[in-house]
Amino acid sequence: MAAISMKELLEAGAHFGHQTRRWDPRMDEYIFTSRNGIHIIDLQKTLRMADDAYNWVKGEAADGANFLFVGTKKQATEAIEEEAKRAGVAYVNHRWLGGTLTNWNTIKTRINKLKELRAAEEDGSFDKLPKKEASQLGKQKAKLEKFLGGIADMEDIPDVMFVVDPKTEEIAVKEARSLNIPVVAMIDTNGNPDLVDVKIPANDDAIRAVKLITSKMADAIIEGRQGQDAGEDSAEKTFADTADGEGDFEESSNNENQEA
């Protein structure tokens, strides 16, 4: 069964690209035609590539990969946060801080600061401070939450990055590539497909299209991890059955020895 239907793509407006004068020629093979100065994306290719991306992401999730969702423009912020949380993965949906991946140790220090402020707020420590100091710490926490809240539980750099609009998220993509982190991206007609490992050509400026593709990537992660959990449960059951069998064997052997 296909991950996405043609009807879903059409209803979401996934086929509308950018103005022809703003295109990146490297996206030519994913363009069907142009109408009224707008490129139209070949949704037959989008269907196939979205399906390939779904299966690839599902496989990575089944193998235990950690994911990071990135989408900081206004059309993507809500979908990125909602779907990342649903899939239980890290996300960045406001400005990408340079060095988030390539200078992870420094970022981790700031995340630890955020966690300290969270704890202080929760245990009532802020209430014991002078109003001015409490206000300053509150503002500091709010700023850290905005930019780092989505990656606060990320223990290390991710194994895979999903991006909405790699042109907008150019710095994030470059950091990922420098660390050999595979990039899965929803890419429009103005993007450079050569910077992306797993491509899904689609309108990355339409909120409904962004929500559709992002939700499918979240679905793939959830499905892959459920398969991983099922495999772990199966392995545990096999081990338990084996242990029970060994217990039966030992009991049988003891009985035979007693009879002898």
Swiss-Prot record:
GO molecular function, one term: structural constituent of ribosome
Pfam families: Ribosomal_S2 (PF00318)
GO biological process: translation
Biased composition (Acidic residues): 243-260
Record's keyword terms, sorted: Ribonucleoprotein, Ribosomal protein
Residue numbers spanned by region Disordered: 224-260
GO cellular component, one term: cytosolic small ribosomal subunit
Superkingdom of source: Bacteria
PANTHER family, per the entry: 30S RIBOSOMAL PROTEIN S2 PROKARYOTIC AND ORGANELLAR, SMALL RIBOSOMAL SUBUNIT PROTEIN US2M
Family: Belongs to the universal ribosomal protein uS2 family.
Protein name per its UniProtKB record: Small ribosomal subunit protein uS2
Organism: Oenococcus oeni (strain ATCC BAA-331 / PSU-1)
Lineage: Bacteria, Bacillati, Bacillota, Bacilli, Lactobacillales
